[in-house]
Amino acid sequence: MPLVAVAGPTGSGKSELALLIAEKFHGEIVNCDSLQVYRHFDIGTAKLPLGERRGIPHHLIDIIDPNELFTAGEYARIARNTIADISARGRLPILAGGTGFYLRALLDGLFEGPARDQPLRDRLTAREARRAGSLHRILRRLDSVSAAKIHANDVPKVTRALEVCLLTQRPVSELFARGRDSLRGYRTLKLGLLPDREVLYPRLDARCAWMFENGLVDEVRAILALGFAAECKPFESHGYKQALQHIRGELNLREAIFYAQRNTRNYAKRQITWFRREPELVWLKDFGNAPEIRETAMDRVAKFLGQ
């Protein structure tokens, strides 16, 4: 069965290209963004409004509350079921999003790691609180392969990797290679958008500013008013973190926008680095709405489908 994935850094036009593919090839879109799964987080995640989806079904958007734990493994399980349902109805499933780890979990599978050990997690958390970056340094010694793939600032992932290492006495990378359950029955065309950074970064800066000017801070206030704690995971993401700091009086509006822009650019850089390691990804070196990219993508998909 055919499966198409549209990947790339934030702001590269994945949603628009996925829509065009879906319209031409009778497809449905499956979200592959780790923030768009959360309800209420709309502006800062660039979630496509219902009125702009052009009648194309979108799946795995707004499926959990901000205070719920949601792992890549859970995403892979739900996404696989969704893809199977779309295919069974004779439609083309199209993955769209920039969370490379979700895409990897879906296509290649994840190993079933040990259950969470809260006392161990508490000790690791306390150590990181005493000295920032200490957990990542330990992970580099125990599992350099995993440490190279996980950013030092992504403390939850670093903590989980260390937890698994310590509980199993094996590197996570080794366990992952042994125990993966890859997606079966599908052949996948992976398209990766790669605009020039000198063009992408200014656009990201402008988009961040637009979000703050068009209700991001009010959206955060509304989420807090619903009773969701500021410690919820999606509040750690770029844009939302700075909006929260602004509400607390820790940053003025100009500073909040500046740091959100900087963090968004850094995130885009990490996404590009991740997707460069993605096997068999076809790079399209511009934005998803560029005419030549549209044409190339449509040709690629048509050939992939044998049309």
Swiss-Prot record:
Alphabetized UniProt keyword annotations: ATP-binding, Magnesium, Nucleotide-binding, Transferase, tRNA processing
Q: Which cofactor does it need?
A: Mg(2+)
State where ATP binds.
8-15
EC numbers: 2.5.1.75
What is any Pfam family matched here? IPPT
Annotated region Interaction with substrate tRNA: the residues are 33-36
The EC category is transferase
Please tell me where substrate binds in this chain. 10-15
Q: Which InterPro entries match?
A: Dimethylallyltransferase, IPT, P-loop_NTPase
List this protein's GO terms for biological process.
tRNA modification
**Reaction catalysed by this enzyme:** adenosine(37) in tRNA + dimethylallyl diphosphate = N(6)-dimethylallyladenosine(37) in tRNA + diphosphate
Q: What's the subunit arrangement here?
A: Monomer.
Q: What is this protein called?
A: tRNA dimethylallyltransferase
Instruction: Please tell me the species this chain comes from.
Output: Solibacter usitatus (strain Ellin6076)
Question: What is the phylogenetic placement of the source species in the record?
Answer: Bacteria, Pseudomonadati, Acidobacteriota, Terriglobia, Bryobacterales
